[in-house]
UniProtKB/Swiss-Prot annotation:
It comes from the Bacteria. Keywords: Cell inner membrane, Cell membrane, Membrane, NAD, Quinone, Translocase, Transmembrane, Transmembrane helix, Ubiquinone. This is NADH-quinone oxidoreductase subunit H. It comes from Cronobacter sakazakii (strain ATCC BAA-894) (Enterobacter sakazakii). Belongs to the complex I subunit 1 family. It is an enzyme of class 7 (translocase).
Length: 326
């Protein structure tokens, strides 16, 4: 087998790593829908899904079967091509955003030097999917939900990017592995506390999760921009939202909590435990907080998050200048 040169083996191993990591992310996103319902039941002192399988363990399988066999309906007056492309773009952009996250020192799909910029680009690409879905559905509620979602996402992406600039300045790199290695002695959550708070808030908003789920507000917009979707097209939006939660949780761990670093246990175990903790925090936030009005969400972003990110940047710049001068 002369074609198995070291370069070919390296390429095959890289492809295998990418497939394994992305399959695990998709599985986590799918399983989180079941885990969320069980945890919400626990938080609200009621039963979660407990009928299919032992203790409801097969509920996810039942949901997948139902979704596969539902009619894949397309509205009569919709733009069929864009209507079909929108969920694919949403799912793919959220999945690709995880590609830059180093799960361990050797396991990362794409160790890019512009890792953070790539994440921001993928987050921005998701806005197009939402706009495509709302406009192509030819439904006023879908369009209103898409307009809300695009305005909210674009606004909070400003704070998302600014909250990361302090981390980039401290590490001197946009590369995620370099940022993790820079936290060997002190996690970024301590010197970049305001950046962490703002990034976590903006991450919830960009994922359109409660309490920032106004684009999908059932009481006002009848489920928003994916009201006309059914079957696997709706499934791509549904699983994509949970993949977004997994990705944002993994980024919080990587950027502010030392990534895979920790004593005794293997690196990927530490990474998985930290990520699972923040995924549970997403669910706890949904269980604990009410949904504010849309104007309150936008006002909170520009009047609270933006000043916090600017203060964080100024303090970080001052500290770096002081350390350089010393």
């Amino acid at each position: 087998m002369s074609w198995l040169t070291p370069d070919v083996i390296e390429i095959l191993l890289s492809i295998l790593k990418a497939v394994v990591i992305l399959l695990v992310v998709v599985s986590c996103g799918a399983f989180m829908s079941f885990g969320e319902r069980r945890l919400l039941g626990l938080f609200q002192n009621r039963y979660g899904p407990n009928r299919v399988g032992w203790g409801g363990s097969l509920q996810l399988v039942a949901d997948m079967i139902k979704m596969f066999f539902k009619e894949d309906w397309i509205p009569r007056f919709s733009d069929r091509v864009i209507f079909t492309l929108a969920p694919m773009i949403a799912f793919t952009s959220l999945l690709l955003a995880f590609a830059i996250v180093p799960v361990s020192p050797t396991w990362v799909v794409a160790d890019l030097n512009i890792g953070i910029l790539f994440f921001l680009m993928m987050a921005g690409l998701g806005v197009y999917a939402v706009l495509f879905a709302g406009w192509s559905s030819n439904n006023k509620y879908s369009l209103l939900g898409a307009m809300r979602a695009s305005a909210q996402t674009l606004s909070y992406e400003v704070f998302l990017g600014l909250s990361l600039m302090g981390v980039v300045a401290q590490a001197g790199s946009f590369n995620m592995t370099d940022i993790v290695n820079n936290q060997a002695h002190l996690w970024n959550v301590i010197p970049q506390f305001f950046g962490f708070i703002t990034f976590a808030i903006a991450g919830v908003a960009v994922c359109h999760r409660h309490p920032f789920d106004q684009p999908e507000a059932e009481q006002e917009l009848a489920d928003g921009y994916h009201i006309e979707y059914s079957g696997m097209k709706f499934g791509l939006f549904f699983v994509g939202e949970y993949i977004g939660i997994v990705t944002v949780s993994a980024l919080i761990v990587t950027l502010f909590f030392g990534g895979w670093q920790g004593p005794w246990l293997p690196p990927f175990i530490w990474f998985a435990l930290k990520t699972a903790f923040f995924m549970m925090m997403f669910i706890l936030i949904r269980a604990a907080l009410p949904r504010p009005r849309y104007d309150q969400v936008m006002s909170f972003g520009w009047k609270v998050c933006l000043p916090l990110t600017l203060i964080n940047l100024l303090v970080t710049a001052a500290v770096i200048l002081w350390q350089t001068a010393a």
